[in-house]
UniProtKB/Swiss-Prot annotation:
GO terms for cellular component: midbody; mitochondrion; nucleoplasm. It is linked to When overexpressed, may be involved in obesity-associated insulin resistance, possibly by causing mitochondrial dysfunction in adipocytes. It holds the Pfam family Complex1_LYR. InterPro entries: Complex1_LYR_dom (IPR008011), Complex1_LYR_LYRM1 (IPR045294), LYRM1 (IPR040330). Keywords: Nucleus. CDD domains: Complex1_LYR_LYRM1 (cd20261). High levels in adipose tissue. The keyword Nucleus applies. May promote cell proliferation and inhibition of apoptosis of preadipocytes. This is LYR motif-containing protein 1. It is found in: Nucleus.
Amino acid sequence: MTTATRQEVLGLYRSIFRLARKWQATSGQMEDTIKEKQYILNEARTLFRKNKNLTDTDLIKQCIDECTARIEIGLHYKIPYPRPIHLPPMGLTPLRGRGLRSQEKLRKLSKPVYLRSHDEVS
């Protein structure tokens, strides 16, 4: 990891913690705010620790893009959780043969940048 990339990643990590410190739930209730702040902190720690040993610059760039997208989406929609995605048309084909391969391809292509680190939910 280059020095510039390292500084960018550390800056994102710090900005997430600053965001969590100032976060207010849209419901206005204190317990919701505390839960959402804790979710932000836990999610950041988990994903940064998961990706700390990456050496490929393209993968690092994808993770940085995902992080900035999740920050921007969270600030815009005022929710810390990833936005749900919907299956693409023809996404529920039979689970065998070519249908399965095309279904997996459609799901992979339709997955937005901000959900790259999340596992496939069945």
